[in-house]
């Protein structure tokens, strides 16, 4: 995912501000949401190819949040009035440079870095059987990794913290822990 961050879209984009139960309280510009650390919604999409490999990328160095870090999810902030599902499809299509992707919702959790950022994270999975043309503003480099390769890279590469947490929860969810 591209990690939801202050730089992942226009700061004047209007998003839903939500409460601890993920209920909409009001709308606000993204700049206000980040400035005041308001709880909001984000989507994460784990994209696999037909061989089960996972789209993994390095964020551009121009990103304000986790520049140059790696991620095994694509995604971003949910717009005001937008459903999690619609946002997951929109973000996956934008970041991968594709059309017609279908995502499957898996689980939701509240991410917090313990300091400043906090958001509801809706995790989806998708399979893509075709070429990708990743968005140059978001993706500096990409590859497709097996789960074993990804788990190995998690110990040697810098990964975005929310993507790391979403991957941990994904593995737990899948094994029923």
Tell me what each language-model feature is.
Residues 9, 71-73, 134-138:
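Short glycine-enriched loop/turn motifs at secondary-structure junctions
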Residues 17, 47, 56, 125-126, ...:
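Conserved hydrophobic "DFG−1" position in protein kinase catalytic cores
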Residues 36-38, 65-69, 145-146:
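A short, polar/proline- and glycine-enriched secondary-structure boundary/capping micro-motif
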Residues 76-82:
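Short, surface-exposed loop/turn motifs that are enriched in glycine and acidic residues
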């Amino acid at each position: 995912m591209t990690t939801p961050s202050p730089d992942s879209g226009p700061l004047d984009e209007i998003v839903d501000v939500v409460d601890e139960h993920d209920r909409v309280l009001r709308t606000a510009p993204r700049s206000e949401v980040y400035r005041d650390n308001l709880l909001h919604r984000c989507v994460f999409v784990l994209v696999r190819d037909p061989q089960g490999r996972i789209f993994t990328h390095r964020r551009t160095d121009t990103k304000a949040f986790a520049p140059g870090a790696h991620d095994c999810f694509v995604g971003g902030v949910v717009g005001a009035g937008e459903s999690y599902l619609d946002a997951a499809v929109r973000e996956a299509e934008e970041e991968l440079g594709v059309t017609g992707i279908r995502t499957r919702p898996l689980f939701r959790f509240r991410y917090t870095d313990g300091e400043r950022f906090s958001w509801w994270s809706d995790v989806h999975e998708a399979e893509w059987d075709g070429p990708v043309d990743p968005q140059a503003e978001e993706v500096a480099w990409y590859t497709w990794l097996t789960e074993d390769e990804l788990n190995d890279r998690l110990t040697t590469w810098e990964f975005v913290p929310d993507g790391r947490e979403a991957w941990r929860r994904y593995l737990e969810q899948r094994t029923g822990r």
